[in-house]
């Protein structure tokens, strides 16, 4: 298997196996693009128009971008600002560090990053916690703003 590609145990193809690492019990690696694709396979990713409609029906937008990025790009009015490094702790309805909006596993969380890559990984992680309706915004904040949906300058209020 030296230098050959293989399929990892979860069925994801394209995993790079170098120097017979998998055969020897070593690490099997995937590219970040493969990780994002695997995450997205389990998500129902709304475009900005559909996300807006879902928000009017009770879905919650969660902006995970760092403060500096939100300062440059702006933010979505009404979105909860929860930086990525604490997201799972804030949204786990069984956790002691949850926010008040994290009432149960059935909340429709729509995670937003800048362009919709980091948010896909974050939404997949939320689903692993049992937040089965969690997803992310296809195209991220950039697509939201390009669609002419509401944005504003930053209000530094982190949760």
Predicted regions and their residues:
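Active-site flanking residues adjacent to catalytic metal/cofactor-binding acidic residues
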Residues: 62
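Short, surface-exposed ligand- or partner-binding patches at beta-edge/loop junctions that are enriched
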Residues: 112
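Rhodanese-like catalytic fold shared by cysteine-dependent sulfurtransferases
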Residues: 1-59, 67-109, 117-159
């Amino acid at each position: 298997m030296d230098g050959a590609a293989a399929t990892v145990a979860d069925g994801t193809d394209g995993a790079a196996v170098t120097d017979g690492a998998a055969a020897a019990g070593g690490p099997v690696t995937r590219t970040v693009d493969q990780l994002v694709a695997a995450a997205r396979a389990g998500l129902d990713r709304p475009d900005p128009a559909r996300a807006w409609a879902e928000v009017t029906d009770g879905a919650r937008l969660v902006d995970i971008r760092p403060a500096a990025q939100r300062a440059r790009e702006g933010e979505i009015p009404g979105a909860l600002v929860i930086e990525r490094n604490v997201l799972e702790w804030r949204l786990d309805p069984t956790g002691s560090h949850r926010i008040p909006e994290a009432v149960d596993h059935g909340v429709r969380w729509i995670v937003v990053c800048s362009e919709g890559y980091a948010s896909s990984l974050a939404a997949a992680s939320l689903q692993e916690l049992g937040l089965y309706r969690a997803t992310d915004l296809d195209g991220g904040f950039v697509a939201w703003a390009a669609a002419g949906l509401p944005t504003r300058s930053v209000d530094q209020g982190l949760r």
